[in-house]
Amino acid sequence: KGHALEGKTTFIDAAIGAELDPYTTVKFRPGQGNISTHTIGSVCSYPLMRVEEMYLIEAEAAAHTDGAKGAALLNTFMKTYRDANYNCTLSNSDEVVQEVVLQKRIELWGEGRSFFDIKRLNMSVTRAYEGTNVPQPVRYNTNGRPAWMNFVLPKFEGVYNTPVYNYNNPDPSGRYRPVK
């Protein structure tokens, strides 16, 4: 009780809302707003792609070649659709790309899109920090793109498909130790 998100998920019934753990969110509205009946509530629209994502992809692409143009596109999107007071004053390409990625993570939170940014941009992942809610056994920090994001083919795929036998991503098991 008393956490910042308490009572903010107004489209679910109060009895179920009271049972949710702190900081549990329901990003997409359940079918007919009914979270109690799984045959109704599970039927909901889950966007595979959103127009907001396209604006942010355009801003990032522009920032890779021209930081000022990327910042201008980001400002246009943010001021038009999110926060009229937002102002990105960066012009360095790398800094603008990082700002766009931050805004993508905020906009597309919970949709699994940061996975692709982390891989493509060779970003580090930091899960061990003061105040983290990541459970200790999986609290990993990386230096660069995490190996756990590489898909490893199952062993028997190579047995029955010999051309891929010697071509596989390295198995990341045991590569990382949790940070205490």
Segments and roles (model prediction):
Residues 1-180:
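Acidic/polar-rich alpha-helix caps and helix-coil junctions
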